[in-house]
Swiss-Prot record:
Contains 4 disulfide bonds. GO terms for cellular component: extracellular region. It comes from Lycosa singoriensis (Wolf spider). Residues 21-26 form a propeptide. Transmembrane segments: none annotated. This is U8-lycotoxin-Ls1m.
């Protein structure tokens, strides 16, 4: 009986460890993907950059994208 309980506990620990490891290995977001609701999920060479959207001086929203680190984007006219 003790062996069955011990075996059950060991199996439970192994399954918990596997689930925790799978949780930590989420796929990262590639370049130009939206990261508004997941700012920490961009791939390691990217950063989540956010931009406010304005209409008549009032902010109407916010967009965030995974972009290259250290790159400055400028608006073209």
């Amino acid at each position: 009986m003790k062996l069955m309980i011990f075996t059950g506990l060991v199996l439970f620990a192994i399954v918990s460890l596997i689930e925790a490891q799978a949780e930590n290995e989420k796929p990262c977001l590639p370049e130009y993907k939206v990261c508004t609701h997941a700012p920490g999920n961009c791939c390691s060479d990217l950063v989540c950059d956010c931009y406010g959207r304005y209409k008549s001086g009032a902010q109407i929203g916010r967009n965030c994208f995974c972009l290259q680190k250290g790159v400055i984007y400028k608006r073209e006219n």
